[in-house]
A protein has these predicted regions:
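Short alpha-helical DNA-recognition segment
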Residues: 14-32
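Short, Lys/Arg-rich amphipathic alpha-helical interaction segments
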Residues: 21, 36-65
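A short, Lys/Arg-rich alpha-helix, primarily the initiator
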Residues: 1-12, 50
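Short amphipathic alpha-helical segments, especially helix-boundary/capping motifs
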Residues: 7, 23-25, 36
Length: 65
């Protein structure tokens, strides 16, 4: 998953990097690293990002329980 794809997912949910990281229980440094191309999400993280893209509210609801 490219940095551009990750940025597009975050832009699609209209959240700042800080809010995105907090709401989806991710480290801000991790999200920043992914978006800057310094880190690459592993398979599980890439799948999680795809879930966020497909159904952000579903993921937020699941994390809230």
């Amino acid at each position: 998953m490219s940095p551009e794809e990750i940025k597009a997912i975050r832009a699609g949910v209209r959240m700042s990097r800080t809010v995105f990281a907090h709401k989806f229980q991710l480290s801000i440094d991790t999200v920043k690293g992914w978006e800057q191309g310094k880190r690459q999400p592993d398979a599980a993280a890439a799948n999680f990002l795809r879930l966020i893209k497909a159904g952000p509210q579903f993921v937020l609801d699941a994390l809230a329980t």
